[in-house]
Amino acid sequence: MRGLLVLSVLLGAVFGKEDFVGHQVLRISVADEAQVQKVKELEDLEHLQLDFWRGPAHPGSPIDVRVPFPSIQAVKIFLESHGISYETMIEDVQSLLDEEQEQMFAFRSRARSTDTFNYATYHTLEEIYDFLDLLVAENPHLVSKIQIGNTYEGRPIYVLKFSTGGSKRPAIWIDTGIHSREWVTQASGVWFAKKITQDYGQDAAFTAILDTLDIFLEIVTNPDGFAFTHSTNRMWRKTRSHTAGSLCIGVDPNRNWDAGFGLSGASSNPCSETYHGKFANSEVEVKSIVDFVKDHGNIKAFISIHSYSQLLMYPYGYKTEPVPDQDELDQLSKAAVTALASLYGTKFNYGSIIKAIYQASGSTIDWTYSQGIKYSFTFELRDTGRYGFLLPASQIIPTAKETWLALLTIMEHTLNHPY
């Protein structure tokens, strides 16, 4: 086994994969606003090359940060000198990546049908796109594949449409993987797609939903970034677009929407993980969805799925003001997380983005809500930080199954409360 790990590191070096040997993920606990500001100072020190998995928000909210090996001592000294407590969540990031790669390699095979497809492992972009074609071929009267655009690097952007007939019927939109490193989301999206085809005509409650509402599912919302997480840098979050005047690549596609764009909660620095881009909708991956939603004109629920933190959130992210539908969205969130917890006891918190996690401007669901899509939600799936973005493949199916129960709750509510 040790030999395999050494081999994987060597192969990574040969094929140009970025390695994370000795990188640690620290969980920082801030006691007051002064400590929050100190951590923000740390965040601004670019030479440390810190990667905030959960950024500084408010006292009592945990902060998770990946620290490269050369920066570990400096970061720990900084925290200790300011009386800020921390613990090591992940001792060596590369060891988790090696385990992930070994698992993928061990279970890699070309599926001949969606029944033989392995839902309990992580897949490449090509494997997921092959899965889309299999699903459509097996369910031609229920599923179709729509290309809504091309990425910055020229890859097709696909959405699955599940429909029992008609055009521009009231619809539900679900997307996964807008942040490319959140692999459990794309994997869950694949499972959702199969689940829809299995349950239609078999499960009465779900059949009632699809008899009236269409479902659009975008499994790989950031294809360039996702391909890059497999080829080069597993920790890549953003798109892969180039910014004039900067050597840094990519825009945070969840800060690029035209809702509070460029306000606090996003960065104007192209090297930041939360860089908002030159202007709203600058990213074709975002603009493709914007154009689709506007052209469709009848989307009633919009659900964007991220990881991690175990949260279900509704607008707003860029301001503290409650949305007009606050009470209904809060009650629906409560019902959805209760349904989710009924399977394995997984606890999700819920609330508006700005209160549940942190201020985020230019986010997906703030824009969709501004377009009149009342049931606009964002999930943060498993876990709460033990593995973070590197959730073991053994948790894919349990994550997807419990999330499906929450999605069903939202979809049923959308069906029963037309507007």
Swiss-Prot record:
PROSITE patterns: CARBOXYPEPT_ZN_1, CARBOXYPEPT_ZN_2, PEPTIDASE_M14
Cofactor: how and how many bound: Binds 1 zinc ion per subunit.
Subcellular location: Secreted
PANTHER family membership: CARBOXYPEPTIDASE A1, PROTEASE FAMILY M14 CARBOXYPEPTIDASE A,B
Record's signal peptide: 1-16
Entry's Gene Ontology BP terms: leukotriene metabolic process; proteolysis; proteolysis involved in protein catabolic process; response to cadmium ion
Pro-peptide region(s): 17-110
Name of the protein this chain belongs to: Carboxypeptidase A1
Superkingdom of source: Eukaryota
EC number: 3.4.17.1
SMART domains for this protein: Zn_pept
Catalytic activity from the UniProt record: Release of a C-terminal amino acid, but little or no action with -Asp, -Glu, -Arg, -Lys or -Pro; leukotriene C4 + H2O = leukotriene F4 + glycine
GO MF annotations, alphabetized: metallocarboxypeptidase activity; zinc ion binding
Function: Carboxypeptidase that catalyzes the release of a C-terminal amino acid, but has little or no action with -Asp, -Glu, -Arg, -Lys or -Pro. Catalyzes the conversion of leukotriene C4 to leukotriene F4 via the hydrolysis of an amide bond.
Keywords: Carboxypeptidase, Disulfide bond, Hydrolase, Metal-binding, Metalloprotease, Protease, Secreted, Signal, Zinc, Zymogen
Annotated coiled-coil segments of the chain: none
CDD domains from the UniProt entry: M14_CPA
Cofactor: Zn(2+)
Family the entry assigns: Belongs to the peptidase M14 family.
Active site: residue positions: 380
Enzyme class name: hydrolase
Activity regulation details: Inhibited by interaction with the S.magnifica carboxypeptidase inhibitor SmCI.
Disulfide feature: 248-271
Binding residue positions for substrate: 179-182, 237, 254-255, 307-308, 358
Subunit structure: Monomer. May form a complex with proelastase 2.
Record's GO cellular component terms: extracellular space
